[in-house]
């Protein structure tokens, strides 16, 4: 095996971050049920999804090198916050994040036909107190619609962040250090 991988994700952010690692990859998307199971903890949920995405890539026939699956979830009060379904959902989410610290969990998994290895990276992010106008203006920008928790730290949403403790890149969607370390461990066997 070489350091080349498959990236089982349509995310342009994950593509960009994996490129930064200098790892050769081919990108494709998988169709996976991303529903959270009843009573499933956010940590278990995000890790299960990353593993599911990687294993789904293997099931599609991508078997000559490791398949990388990843998922990110924003958590506040031990509740997972998904991508906003509409402006009302988004407004409710950002009001919960406003003036508070939340966790961003990003899971990374590598899979082949005979093994799966995964890890979860947790980062604490603190938001300033947001006005209704800031929340509405941010929604109108179009940026929050496809983001877990309704914001992108690497874009306009970054201006709401007063403090971060952990991996910035995990919040964006792929923790660089941990991804590289996990791949090295995976390839060593």
From Swiss-Prot:
Keyword Hydrolase: yes
MF annotations from Gene Ontology: dTTP diphosphatase activity; UTP diphosphatase activity
Cellular compartment(s): Cytoplasm
GO cellular component, one term: cytoplasm
EC number of this enzyme: 3.6.1.9
Primary residence: cytoplasm
Enzyme class label: hydrolase
Record-annotated active site: 71
CDD domains: Maf
Entry keyword Hydrolase: yes
Family: Belongs to the Maf family. YhdE subfamily.
Protein name: dTTP/UTP pyrophosphatase
Species annotation: Pseudoalteromonas translucida (strain TAC 125)
Organism placement in taxonomy: Bacteria, Pseudomonadati, Pseudomonadota, Gammaproteobacteria, Alteromonadales
């Amino acid at each position: 095996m070489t350091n080349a991988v498959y990236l089982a994700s349509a995310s342009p952010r994950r593509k960009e971050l994996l490129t930064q690692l200098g790892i050769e990859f081919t990108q494709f998307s998988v169709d996976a049920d991303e529903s959270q199971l009843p009573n499933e903890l956010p940590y278990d949920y995000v890790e299960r999804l990353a593993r599911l995405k990687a294993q789904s890539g293997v099931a599609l026939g991508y078997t000559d090198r490791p398949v990388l699956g990843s998922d990110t979830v924003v958590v506040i009060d031990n509740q997972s916050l998904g991508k906003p379904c509409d402006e009302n959902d988004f407004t409710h989410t950002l009001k919960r994040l406003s003036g508070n610290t939340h966790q961003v969990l990003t899971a990374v998994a590598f899979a082949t036909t005979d093994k799966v290895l995964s890890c979860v990276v947790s980062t604490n992010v603190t938001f300033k107190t947001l006005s209704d106008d800031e929340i509405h203006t941010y929604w109108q920008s179009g940026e929050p619609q496809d983001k877990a928790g309704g914001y992108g730290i690497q874009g306009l949403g970054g201006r709401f962040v007063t403090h971060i403790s952990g991996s910035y890149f995990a919040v964006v969607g792929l923790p660089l250090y941990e991804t590289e370390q996990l791949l090295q461990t995976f390839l060593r066997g």
